[in-house]
Structures are given as C-alpha cells and as structure tokens.
C-alpha cells in the first residue's frame, strides 16, 4: 500500500523567496562516524543559535553499522564491522563506500515544525533523485525508506534502495538519508536491515539494478531534486575549523 505521507503538502518545507540558501558540502575522503556525529551536533547547535546557515553534507563512511533508537540486540547477526549507537530514529543499517550519505541540518522551526512532513519531504527528495535515472522509487505504509519493485525476483518482491533516519534538537534536524549507489551489498547480510525480516524485501543499489551510475552522477541529481523540495542551495563556504571537520 502506498504510504499516505505521499499526500502531505510539501510546499511549506521550502523557505520564502529571498531566504538564505542551504549550504552544500561534499566530502571526498571517507569520514569516520564519530567525527561526523560531532560535526553534525556542533553545526545543528550553531543553526539553532542563529550562528550558521543550514547545511546538507554529502559523504561516505568506512564500513560500519549504526543502530537507531528502535534497534534491537538481535539485529546485528555478525559483528563484521564496528556498531555505533546513533541516536537517530530507526533500527540497524549499514554504511560504507559506494553509499551516498546525506546529512541534512535544517531549521524546521522556520520551515515547518512537523516531523511527519519532514520525513515525507526526505522521501520525495529521494524519489526525485532516483527519477533522474529512470528508477521508480516508492513509499510504503509499513516500511520506512524508499523501495523499488523487483518483478524479476518474483511477485511482490521489493528492494530497499535508500534509508532514512532523522533526529531533531530544538527543531533543527540532523542525520538524514543514505542512497545505495554501489556499496558491497553482502555487508547487509550481517544485519536485519531496518528490522525487516520478510524474505520478499531485500536491499539493492543503482548499480545492482544495472545502471552505470557514479557517486558524482548521484550528487548532481541529489542537488537538483533537493532544490525542488527544500529550495535553493549554495556551495558551502566553511570557516577553517568547520572545514577541518567537514573535509
């Protein structure tokens, strides 16, 4: 069943014309998870205090697992890589090279203080990004994230191509989304991804779907689709201390 979040009005998630653009930062090197968390928390606090602009930060992590606030002990089947308690919503997932993570730090008090509408907007952003590659991403009522139908695997089979996990502090968001471009999908076999145990529902990536897509291709699509949902962006001009953290 299609998720009723699809019916939410997304227009209020963008700011009025003339509002400051969202800073857009891309890290080329792998970013350790603890470093990313520290940078996000510092930036979110600065945004809440009116001392920094909103930010979208694109990066890759080294191979690791993270557990959200709904994670269960049994979700990690094989401790192949480090497991971090993330504080975001959701359960256990994998991050690693070939997966584009986008950490999103927006002031929802100014945009729309509505968590449900924000998650719907993130889903729409992902769906718009996938559409650039002629991939139909879909919401599901009982499963978070964005899914693609896999009729090649059988009737009713679907694979998750993008994950969502968010946290808010003083109505500033952090954490965000992860789109599988070309990660090693075998690493998902060491966990119960996002708590989904039904064998009809797996994990896929753009390359797994047969598309010769690079991270750089996805970055372009992400930025265009983001602006359609949330409004204008601008290349981040970070202070020296922030640049050290954000690569």
From Swiss-Prot:
Site feature: Lowers pKa of active site Cys: 160
Task of the protein: Catalyzes the transfer of endogenously produced octanoic acid from octanoyl-acyl-carrier-protein onto the lipoyl domains of lipoate-dependent enzymes. Lipoyl-ACP can also act as a substrate although octanoyl-ACP is likely to be the physiological substrate.
Subcellular location field: Cytoplasm
Associated pathway: Protein modification; protein lipoylation via endogenous pathway; protein N(6)-(lipoyl)lysine from octanoyl-[acyl-carrier-protein]: step 1/2
List of residues binding substrate: 88-95, 163-165, 176-178
Gene Ontology terms: biological process: protein modification process
Organism listed in the record: Rhodopseudomonas palustris (strain BisB18)
Keyword Membrane: no
Protein name from the UniProt record: Octanoyltransferase
Gene (UniProt): lipB
Major site of localization recorded for this protein: cytoplasm
Catalytic activity: octanoyl-[ACP] + L-lysyl-[protein] = N(6)-octanoyl-L-lysyl-[protein] + holo-[ACP] + H(+)
EC numbers, comma separated: 2.3.1.181
UniProt domain BPL/LPL catalytic: residue ranges: 50-234
Membrane-spanning segments: none
Alphabetized UniProt keyword annotations: Acyltransferase, Cytoplasm, Transferase
Gene3D superfamilies: Bira Bifunctional Protein, Domain 2 (3.30.930.10)
Enzyme class: transferase
A GO CC term attached to the entry: cytoplasm
UniProt record similarity statement: Belongs to the LipB family.
Gene Ontology MF terms: lipoyl(octanoyl) transferase activity
PROSITE patterns noted in UniProt: BPL_LPL_CATALYTIC, LIPB
CDD domains: LipB
Active site as annotated: 194 (acyl-thioester intermediate)
